[in-house]
């Protein structure tokens, strides 16, 4: 009899805890403020260029190197290399110079990558790279399938006209 009473009390206590947890979780959800719609991205009217080659030229050229003749949704942001590398690939890099972080979409295959014999080349729907502001040298490059929706955390994002 005593055991039945203890088990009954335990069951009631568990039910109350589960109900309280569900109420707490749902209250938290209802109080969240929905994220505002992203502001339209301004198309850059002037692009950085070095020795007659613009940032757009660099993006289109590297897309072509990776098999994509018509990349879409090309964007860039002026930032520092440390911040860009951390966002784009989670890396800590050896310099923190001013740079442009560039992201574009398409179907990319890096056939120029060094890889073991028989290995498949890197592929991705997103190309991300970092270009040094001072001379246009590409310091970082990668392919993946990430959208980089939070590129605006690095600064003002601008679109590159197709």
Q: Residues of each region from the PLM?
A:
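Sec-dependent signal peptide cleavage junction
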Residues: 22-36
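A short, surface-exposed interaction/processing loop segment used at functional sites
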Residues: 117-162
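Exposed beta-strand-loop-beta-strand "reactive/processing" segments of non-cytosolic proteins
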Residues: 71-129
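N-terminal Sec-pathway targeting helices
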Residues: 1-15, 24-26
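Extended hydrophobic/Leu-rich segments
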Residues: 6-10, 50, 80, 146, ...
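Short, non-transmembrane alpha-helical segments in secretory-pathway proteins
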Residues: 33-97, 160-162
């Amino acid at each position: 009899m005593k055991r039945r009473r203890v088990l009954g009390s335990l069951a009631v206590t568990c039910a109350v805890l589960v109900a309280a947890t569900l109420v707490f979780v749902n209250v938290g959800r209802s109080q969240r403020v929905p994220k505002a719609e992203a502001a339209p991205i301004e198309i850059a009217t002037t692009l950085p260029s070095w020795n007659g080659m613009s940032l757009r030229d660099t993006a289109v050229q590297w897309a072509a190197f990776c098999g994509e003749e018509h990349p879409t949704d090309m964007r860039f942001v002026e930032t520092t290399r440390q911040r860009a590398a951390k966002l784009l690939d989670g890396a800590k890099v050896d310099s923190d110079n001013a740079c442009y972080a560039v992201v574009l979409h398409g179907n990319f295959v890096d056939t120029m990558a060094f890889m073991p014999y028989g290995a498949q080349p890197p592929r991705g729907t997103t190309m991300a790279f970092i270009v040094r502001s001072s001379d246009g040298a590409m310091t970082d490059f990668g392919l993946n399938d990430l959208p980089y929706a939070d590129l605006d955390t690095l600064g003002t994002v601008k679109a590159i006209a197709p």
